[in-house]
C-alpha cells in the first residue's frame, strides 16, 4: 500500500484546522469533511504487533502510529496512545484485561465509592479517601503489604506514568511537525487511563 508524503506539514496543519473550524462552527461550507480516527488499538495490530508487545514498548507504539498515519492520512485523532498497561501493572494489575489471542482489551469496571461512603468522602476529603480507600480497593494496595511495599509500588507506577507522559508528548510534538496534525480533540494532549483516574467521574463506575 502506497504511503502518503507530507511535504508541507505547517500548511497541512493550517488546512486541517480550517476544515475542522468550518465543519464545527458551520459559518461556511467546508472544502471537505475532516476525517477523525478513533482507531484505538487497531494501528498496533495493523503493524503486526501484539497488544502486549506494543503496550510494553512505547517505541513500537510510536512506530505503529506513524505507519498508520502514513498509510491512511487522518486529519485528527481522538488520541494517539491511551494505554497505561505498565502503570496499572506496577500497582498490582487488573485494570486492563488484554487477550492477545483475540486482539481484545477490556477495562474492569469497579465501584470505587460504595453506597455508604459519601459521608466518609466528605469527612476525609478527596486525597485521604483516595489513598485510604480507592487505592486499596482498586489495586489491592495495603492488602498483605507493608507500608513500605505499598509506597514502592506507587513510586514505580509514577515512574511508569512519567514514561508514558513522555512518550505521548513526543508523539504529539513529532506528529505535528512531521504530519501536520494538531492537538487531539481531547482537552489534554492525549487521553489515557491513569492510576489517578478522574475519580470525580469514575468513583461510581463507568
Role assignments for model-derived ranges:
Residues 1-206:
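Catalytic cores of TIM-barrel enzymes
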Amino acid at each position: 500500500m502506497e504511503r502518503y508524503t507530507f511535504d508541507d506539514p505547517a500548511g497541512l496543519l493550517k488546512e486541517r484546522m480550517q476544515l475542522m473550524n468550518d465543519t464545527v462552527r458551520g459559518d461556511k461550507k467546508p472544502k471537505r469533511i475532516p476525517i477523525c480516527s478513533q482507531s484505538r488499538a487497531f494501528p498496533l495490530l495493523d503493524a503486526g504487533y501484539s497488544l502486549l508487545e506494543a503496550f510494553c514498548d512505547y517505541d513500537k507504539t510510536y512506530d505503529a502510529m506513524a505507519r498508520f498515519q502514513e498509510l491512511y492520512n487522518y486529519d485528527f485523532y481522538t488520541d494517539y496512545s491511551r494505554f497505561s498497561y505498565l502503570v496499572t501493572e506496577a500497582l498490582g494489575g487488573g485494570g486492563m484485561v488484554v487477550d492477545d489471542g483475540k486482539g481484545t482489551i477490556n477495562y474492569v469496571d469497579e465501584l470505587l465509592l460504595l453506597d455508604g461512603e459519601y459521608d466518609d468522602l466528605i469527612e476525609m476529603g478527596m486525597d485521604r479517601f483516595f489513598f485510604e480507600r480507592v487505592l486499596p480497593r482498586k489495586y489491592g494496595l495495603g492488602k498483605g503489604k507493608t507500608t513500605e511495599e505499598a509506597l514502592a509500588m506507587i513510586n514505580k507506577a509514577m515512574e511508569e506514568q512519567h514514561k508514558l507522559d513522555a512518550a505521548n508528548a513526543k508523539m504529539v510534538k513529532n506528529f505535528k511537525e512531521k504530519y501536520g496534525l494538531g492537538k487531539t480533540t481531547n482537552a489534554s494532549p492525549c487521553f489515557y487511563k491513569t492510576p489517578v483516574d478522574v475519580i470525580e467521574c469514575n468513583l461510581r463506575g463507568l
